[in-house]
Curated annotation (Swiss-Prot):
One annotated Gene Ontology cellular component of this protein: cytosol
InterPro entries: BRCT_dom, BRCT_dom_sf, DisA/LigA_HHH, DNA_ligase, DNA_ligase_AS, DNA_ligase_CS, DNAligase_adenylation, DNAligase_N
NCBIfam families (UniProt xref): dnlj, PRK07956.1
Gene: ligA
Family note: Belongs to the NAD-dependent DNA ligase family. LigA subfamily.
Stated name of the protein: DNA ligase
Keyword Manganese: yes
Binding site for Zn(2+): 481, 484, 500, 506
Purpose: DNA ligase that catalyzes the formation of phosphodiester linkages between 5'-phosphoryl and 3'-hydroxyl groups in double-stranded DNA using NAD as a coenzyme and as the energy source for the reaction. It is essential for DNA replication and repair of damaged DNA.
Pfam families: BRCT (PF00533), DNA_ligase_aden (PF01653), DNA_ligase_OB (PF03120), DNA_ligase_ZBD (PF03119), HHH_2 (PF12826)
PANTHER family: CHROMOSOME TRANSMISSION FIDELITY FACTOR 18 (PTHR23389), DNA LIGASE (PTHR23389:SF9)
Active site positions: 175
Catalytic function, reaction form: NAD(+) + (deoxyribonucleotide)n-3'-hydroxyl + 5'-phospho-(deoxyribonucleotide)m = (deoxyribonucleotide)n+m + AMP + beta-nicotinamide D-nucleotide
Classification of source organism: Bacteria, Bacillati, Actinomycetota, Actinomycetes, Bifidobacteriales
Organism: Bifidobacterium longum subsp. infantis (strain ATCC 15697 / DSM 20088 / JCM 1222 / NCTC 11817 / S12)
Residue ranges of domain BRCT in the record: 839-921
Amino acid sequence: MSTNEQLAWDFDDGDVAEVRPDTGIARFAPGSEQWIAALQPTDDDAIRLDRFDVNTMTAEAAARLWARVAAWVESDQIAYYIDDSPVSSDAAYDARMRCLERLEAAFPSLDNPQSPTHRVGGSFSNDFVSVRHPSRMMSLDDVFSIEELKDWYDSVIRDLDWPESKPLPMSCEVKIDGLALNLIYRNGVLEQGLTRGDGVTGEDITLNVRTIGSIPANLGGPKEDVPDFVEIRGEVFMRWDDFHTLNNEQEDAGRAPFANPRNAAAGSLRQKDPRITATRRLSFYAHGLGQLTWGADHPRGTHDVVADQSQAYDLYTRWGVPVSPHNRAVTSFQEILDMIEYYGEHRGDIEHALDGIVVKVDDLGLQRTLGATSRAPRWAIAYKYPPEEVNTELLNITVQVGRTGRVTPVAVLKPVYVAGSTVARTTLHNGFEVKRKGVLIGDTVVVRKAGDVIPELVGPVLERRKGREDQLREFVMPEFCPSCGAKLAPAKEGDKDIRCPNVESCPAQLTERVISLASRKAFDIEHLGEQSAIALTNPEENRPDSVATYAPNITEVLVAPGEEPDPYEPVEGLELPAAQKPVLSNESGLFDLTAADLRDVRVWREAAIVEVHETVGANGKKKKVRKRVGGSGLWHQVPAFWTAPTPAKKLTAKQLAERAQREAAIESAETQGGAASETTGAPTGAEAPLGTMPGFAAASYPEYDVPADAVIVRVDHKTTRTGVTDVPVIIRPGENTRKMFDEMDKARHADLWRVLVALSIRRLGPPTARLIASAMGSLAAIEKATIEDLTAIDGVGPEIAESVVNWFAATREPGDWRGATLRAWQAAGVGVDEAETSSLPQTLAGKTVVVTGSLEGYSRDSAKEAIIERGGKAAGSVSKKTDYVVIGANAGSKAIKAEELGIPMLGEIQFAQLLETGSID
């Protein structure tokens, strides 16, 4: 293409766009590597793509062009469908899409289900496919004391044979409490975003990564600074101010707040719908490099031009990739201690949560000399701050009842901020533990977070008791269940735990069982969470004790900053509504539920106190800022599963015409003896509604949008300039309710092991349920199994076998709730499918593997499941029969025993290799 050539296209509106000839790309032959690298996401280059004949390309060049254009199209789709702020013209977007389609037609290997050409409209979702990292993404070893840190520092000096008198450059940075992320850029274009996973493979969360504003879609800076390929490692996190804003929004919407910023970031980053992630205000800081390739034709050449961490940070800055401002270059151990001391005192003063200081050898050449273990580099270490301890008041000790009837004392604390989140409650495990700690209700107590995660009540501050003895009282475990009133007792002699024996109908136990059966470890009914479970089993939870705190029309109390709410005076004659009966009295009716059954279920919500003040926005205009500051103690009821009454939307003339057209198509199809095609679509309201109030028929209001599942509850008379108009007011199942029923339908065909877990059989978890389901093959066979049959299965112990046999024996007792549940579920199609055989290669057949310690890429259960799925036995103890022991962080006595017995010990990387190949050779 000559530099004088002009290209143009006609847009739909007749305008013409011309390519400016001074872009530099015209110097290169179309389709060449230089031409592909010079392409930019501009309208000009989109025209070039539209005119380019892809059939002249080699397969390798086509793959490079496809990757570049696909990334731009995906960014365009996210900007349009998710962010609602298009960045490209429709014509440019269409041209790029046509280019992809031509490439995929000419080179079929490029056509894959993840291609943007297969995405319809705004149907974005993440499948979280596992992808191999181009280079291993390691974790860091932790140390918890200055002595351990000094040992590491001395070992680095010793291994490098570094002269004592010569300063060793190191870099120190705060350890962000977030999620590790690997960003892959090819020719400066963001290609993929991967979670750490097990360090060898991670989950592809590219769609969600593209919604994070601080992560550039294209690397900036001069072309000579942009490599052919680079992996940028960093941390996704949520700033404190964004975290508090999100939690206010959660509470305003009646949803549970997140415990801490890390949980919020993790939950946001792993959303299947990236539109949700886009609203969560996530941030990113880069802190490391993976693979870096400049390419033979690159101005920098093929040599490694990044010599140390400081140069890497300089590159990030030029590329537009953010780095943490909280880092220092140091040359002595004392300077490292200074950094640790400073941020230990200022943990709450920076923009994000932190849980330690990372120390790295600065020089990349020295890093390579030091090398790495199977899971972590030897040239870096993470110093973890000791658990933060604070004092607060023990207001009360209550008890909670779990799904198996276990009654646990819970400390109710004066809310206190500790290690990244507010703590108001923490478990005390059992009555013996309360006595051992020696705490009294009313004590000032010490609270910390074990591992900076789990709140723990350490004990009382005895000095604070002086002069207050008459205000303190001892906790006594209750004699009767606080939920159902049944007499409490240990399950057997010698048990420390006491239990509620009313397994069938204790509301607290039933609620916990429903939460459990809907969890990911069982039926995986995502939209049947804690609040929905409470609404189904105990809708009167939080019912006010008297009318004095019943405020049916108050959903929030507005106050000025620093003001207290006015006293509440109930309306004269106000009475509490009649108590509701729960929809579920046990699990048997779960799969028989319909949306109509849930129409009148209402739950209690506390009105929030909202502080409102005026401020001036960036545009100079006044705006009101709202902040939730607490609960008011006033309660009202809200629909749990259906929407509140809402006026139906009036259809436009165009919408009415489209509906008439669809109805005509359906009528025509029915007349011809067929059914309307799926593409024609049934009109809104085509199905019979669940029911309407007497006298209110949807057909009477054809000009309004009344969905098929909606109910008209009343008709409002609206006065307009043309007279009085009747507006139907409707209710319908909420979006989450509709999703819940869809997920329940899928759960009818859940794997057999999931059904076993959902039955809440004591001691039976997913790994053992998988073993039993795989060996027995059907629910009918498991029902008939003896203890001997089950213990004959490798990995099933006598206690679990006894629990399973006893549970199914109870189902045969007349009137037993477990039998009713089992028969009702089977009638609904649950558990009637045969157990599925694992489709994974049986790489571990005949091998016994023990997992100990914490793994980055696996929970304890998921690691065991990975072993079992591949034919292996996931044992709980180390013996001479053990083939391998997988060692994670904080491994205990099992690692010592494995070493004594000479059993191969694997890191997480080797574990991944073992799963894949069955060998570590």
